[in-house]
Amino acid sequence: MNKHKKIPLRKCVVTGEMKPKKELIRVVRSKEGEISVDPTGKKNGRGAYLTLDKECILAAKKKNTLQNQFQSQIDDQIFDELLELAEKVKK
């Protein structure tokens, strides 16, 4: 009998698409309220997943999607870091 390994799926908060966890990037808000990018997906706190795509990240910034998810202000530095990661993955 062939056993298939279960692939964890997560929903992108911008597009609403279910994708494999490895195709998405996690942004996390810690208990202290600090928001950071979590490339490993292991940090503690409230997480939100974004598709690692420039258009998706810019749409999240424009629509304030992450601010609504975390109910707190998001620095432009977080979006810059996400865009940088998207560029690295694209190459």
Curated annotation (Swiss-Prot):
Signal peptide: none
Gene3D superfamilies reported in the protein's UniProt record: YlxR-like (3.30.1230.10)
Pfam families, A to Z: YlxR
Name listed for the protein in its UniProt record: Uncharacterized protein YlxR
Species assigned in the record: Bacillus subtilis (strain 168)
Organism taxonomic ancestry: Bacteria, Bacillati, Bacillota, Bacilli, Bacillales
Gene name, Swiss-Prot/TrEMBL: ylxR
